[in-house]
Amino acid sequence: MTLNWLRRDNELKDHALLGEEYFGTEAPSVIYERRPITDPQGNTVAGLFASWIILNNPTQYNSYTTEMVKAVIAGFQRASSDRAVVAVVFTAVGDKAFCTGGNTAEYSAYYSKRPNEYGEYMDLFNAMVDGILNCKKPVICRVNGMRVGGGQEIGMATDLTITSDLAIFGQAGPKHGSAPDGGSTDFLPWMLNMEDAMYNCVSCEPWSAYKMRAKNLVTKVVPVLKKDGEWVRNPLVRTDAYVDDGELVYGEAVAADQVKAAKELMAQCTTDFSKLDAAVNELVWKFTNLFPHCLIKSIDGIRGKKKFFWDQFKLANRHWLAVNMNHEAYLGFNAFDAKKVTGKDVIDFVKYRQLVAEGALFDDKLAEQVLAKPKA
């Protein structure tokens, strides 16, 4: 006996919420590509793809504009609902930066002193992070350059990171008028120990890709420099030893007297991302050969721990970040945006603290005293 008497509808549904209207090719934009899966021999696998979501704003270190945030949301929803997609690769254009976070030109010129507007922007930002964390495909962050500030936050929202060894990682908020409450204060204590998480969060010091590998924040680090056909590991970073004179040195900067020679060596090299792409493709192929539903259930089980504190704090953080646009963000983002005019990208912190200690009003008079003056 068959069950052909039961009603069935076998026409495939389209679960994509958004079309392609948010994607583009001219910077600033987000490029969305559906690239065929290839096996280890380079053969194309019919009918299966990896979605590449590519930040495209290289002249501003791939910082995301408001419209780019919308496009990232659209990209992850599209990839998540595409039954032919095996995995998502989240990356960026160029060799300098994966992402440095929000666009400070927008932040300073438009959003500062407009807290309601920034609150609405944060609704989009939170939706972008949620889109990454909720994507029903494994998400690989292919780090082609620096991943700092909000770029570090959206990068840590992904499932696994494979990075160029020229990349640096870190936060910038406390130095430039904000707090990394777009994910870093939630994710860092999971991904690093509490001491490292605290220091990395508040020091605003960039850490090398190798240091982050040693700290287990990234999955794999690959060289991208080549000289005479041979791979050259980042000469600005110690990879020759783990301990030197009792100090942990792996992933730390080389000594000051070695920097000049390191930069000279880098100038003789070419940049080649083929090894990075091979590592990404190897991971995508690994995913291809796993049960898809068992894979995503396993991933969502791990993600749930990352999401726990993110979901607890994202709304309260949204409101604080909005209000802060009337406060220290106004100073910090404008100082950073005006650095070509003033020659300085931060405020006079000592003067600011002195004014705070005096109980000074937070007004334009205060701002004039702590912001650098335009160069003559």
Language-model regions, residue ranges each:
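Short amphipathic alpha-helices within nucleic acid-binding modules
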Residues: 61-64
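A structural preference for short, pocket-lining loop segments at secondary-structure junctions
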Residues: 46-56, 70-113, 130-141, 160, ...
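Hydrophobic alpha-helical segments typical of transmembrane helices
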Residues: 124-128, 184-187, 196, 297, ...
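An acidic, glycine-rich surface segment that forms the CoA-thioester-binding/catalytic face
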Residues: 7, 69-73, 77-80, 104-144, ...
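C-terminal alpha-helix plus adjacent terminal tail
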Residues: 1-49, 95, 208-210, 225-376
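Glycine-centered loop/turn positions within well-structured domains
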Residues: 59, 95-96, 186, 198
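Glycine- (often His-adjacent) and acidic-residue-rich active-site loop
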Residues: 7, 13, 17-22, 92-128, ...
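Crotonase-fold acyl-CoA enzyme core
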Residues: 131-292
